[in-house]
């Protein structure tokens, strides 16, 4: 199952995650965005409770799963009206439209048209918005995927408050030291992650937690007590840190 959204962070380590989280498991997954990871796990028999604390993301997915054809029609109607100047205006303003289906359609258009895969930022890249994108939108049909809107801005608090499941998954993506972030405004489609706080939570949690990260040297020390599995740029398992592209980290 291929998601209709462009991934802001694309993962090659889903096979590793599938080995850690068995089929028929119930999973709370956080940082839900493109659905790349969650849809793949749902399509192979895992019940995915896909959490986001950004309403715009939740709203898009609810419209997609409720009636993908209606969403495709709305996107096809509005897309020709968006010129270059309006694209950059909408990056800051699309959430202010009153019509929910229009907002969801704009989310899809802006995501596919953004060089970053983020609706709120990136350069205009029209090559990614083509007939194939509409085809993916119309074809997307997956069971066992349930979007959940978390109202707390604190990611870790939302994890603690979630309904009890055996597994918790976080496709985090890129690591940072969270420098100079205090007081910065938050985009409508970006969830802040405080990586050291997350590591502390993982170390103390009774839940089985799986993290997906792009390679970063700091992670080897931060998670030295945990199970770290590496894959290369082609998704193949490797023990060579020099060839490591992604890291899957588990506290079990």
What are these regions (language model features)?
Residues 29-33, 51-52, 148-151, 170-172, ...:
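Short His-Asn-centered micro-motif
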Residues 40-44, 139-140, 218-225:
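Short loop/helix-cap segments at secondary-structure boundaries that form the rim of catalytic
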Residues 1-23, 68-183, 244:
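SAM-dependent nucleic-acid methyltransferase catalytic core
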Residues 10, 16-82:
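Conserved S-adenosyl-L-methionine
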Residues 37-40, 57-59, 116-119, 176-179, ...:
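Short catalytic/ligand-binding loop motif for oxyanion handling, primarily in non-cytosolic enzymes
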């Amino acid at each position: 199952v291929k998601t209709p959204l462009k991934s802001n962070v694309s993962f090659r380590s889903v096979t590793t995650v599938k080995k850690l989280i068995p089929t028929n498991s119930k999973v709370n997954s956080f940082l839900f965005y493109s659905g790349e990871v969650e849809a793949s796990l749902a399509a192979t028999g895992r019940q995915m409770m896909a959490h986001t604390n950004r309403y715009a993301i939740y709203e898009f997915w609810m419209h997609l799963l409720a009636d993908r054809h209606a969403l495709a029609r709305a996107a096809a109607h509005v897309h020709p009206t968006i010129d270059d100047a309006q694209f950059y205006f909408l990056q800051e303003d699309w959430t202010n439209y009153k019509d929910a289906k229009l907002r969801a359609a704009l989310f899809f258009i802006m995501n596919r048209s953004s060089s970053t895969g983020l609706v709120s930022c990136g350069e205009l890249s029209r090559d990614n918005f083509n007939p194939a994108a509409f085809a993916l939108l119309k074809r997307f049909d997956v069971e066992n995927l349930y979007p959940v809107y978390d109202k707390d801005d604190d990611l870790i608090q939302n994890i603690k408050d979630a309904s009890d499941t055996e597994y918790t998954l976080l496709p985090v993506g890129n690591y940072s030291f969270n420098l100079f972030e205090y007081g910065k405004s938050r985009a409508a489609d970006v969830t802040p992650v405080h990586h050291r706080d997350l590591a502390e939570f993982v170390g103390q949690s009774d839940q089985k937690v799986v993290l997906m990260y792009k390679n970063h040297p700091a992670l080897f020390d931060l998670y030295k007590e945990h199970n770290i599995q590496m894959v290369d740029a082609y998704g193949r398992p490797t023990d060579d840190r020099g060839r490591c592209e992604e890291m899957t980290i588990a506290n079990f």
